[in-house]
Amino acid sequence: MEKNYMTIPYVIEQTSRGERSYDIYSRLLKDRIIFLGGEINDDVANVVIAQLLFLESADPEKDISLYINSPGGVVTAALGMYDTMQYVKPDVATLCVGQAASAGALLLAGGAKGKRFATANSRIMIHQPSGGSRGMVTDMEIQLKETIRLKSILNNIMANHTGQDIKKLEADMDRDYFMSAEEAKDYGIIDKVFSSRE
C-alpha cells in the first residue's frame, strides 16, 4: 500500500531578534486559526481539542477560527471536538473551505451563531451515522443500540444549531444530503457565504 506523505510548508518570519521558522499550521495557530483538513479520527480530534484549549488559555475573550475541509470521519472524535467548541469561553467561528461532510458538517454547524461561514463553492453534506459490527448477535445488538443513540444525539445537535424541525432533519439525514454553500445557509448550517475577504 502506497503512503501519501504531504510536505508541510514552513514560513520564515523576520523579527528584530532574527529569523524564526514555523510550520504553516503553527503559524496559523499564532493567529488563532485552527485548520481541520482531511478525515476526522481520534488523533486529529486530540490535536484540535488541545489547540482549542491552548487558545482559550492564551486569551479567553478573543475568537478562535476553525477552518474545515473534511469528508467527515469518526463520530465520537467529532463529538469530542464539538463538545470542546461549546465548552471553551471564546466564540469559535467556523469556515468551510472545500467541503464539510458528515462529522465535518456537525462541526461547521456547531460554530458560534452568526460566525458560521462557507466559501462560495464549498459543499456541505449531512447524513446519519454509519456503523458496522460482526461477531455474536448479542454484541451486534449492543453496537446497533449505540449507533441509534449516536444518531439521536447528532440529530438533536443539528436541529438545535440549524433551527430545522427534528422530523425534517431526520428525513434529510436518512441518506446523503448534499448542499451548496447557499443551500447550507438557507438550511441554517451556516450564516453567510464568502466569496472574498471583507
Swiss-Prot record:
Pfam families, sorted: CLP_protease
GO CC term (a single one): cytoplasm
Cystine crosslinks: none
Name of this protein: ATP-dependent Clp protease proteolytic subunit
EC number(s) from the headed UniProt entry: 3.4.21.92
Keyword Chaperone set for record: no
SUPFAM superfamilies recorded: ClpP/crotonase (SSF52096)
Annotated catalytic residues: S102 (nucleophile), H127
Reaction(s) the record says it catalyses: Hydrolysis of proteins to small peptides in the presence of ATP and magnesium. alpha-casein is the usual test substrate. In the absence of ATP, only oligopeptides shorter than five residues are hydrolyzed (such as succinyl-Leu-Tyr-|-NHMec, and Leu-Tyr-Leu-|-Tyr-Trp, in which cleavage of the -Tyr-|-Leu- and -Tyr-|-Trp bonds also occurs)
Subcellular localization, as worded in the UniProt entry: Cytoplasm
Top-level taxon of origin: Bacteria
Subunit structure: Fourteen ClpP subunits assemble into 2 heptameric rings which stack back to back to give a disk-like structure with a central cavity, resembling the structure of eukaryotic proteasomes.
Any one GO MF annotation of this record: serine-type endopeptidase activity
CDD domains listed in its UniProt record: S14_ClpP_2
NCBIfam families assigned to the protein according to its UniProt record, in alphabetical order: clpP (TIGR00493), PRK00277.1 (NF001368), PRK12553.1 (NF009205)
UniProtKB keywords: Cytoplasm, Hydrolase, Protease, Serine protease
Catalytic EC class: hydrolase
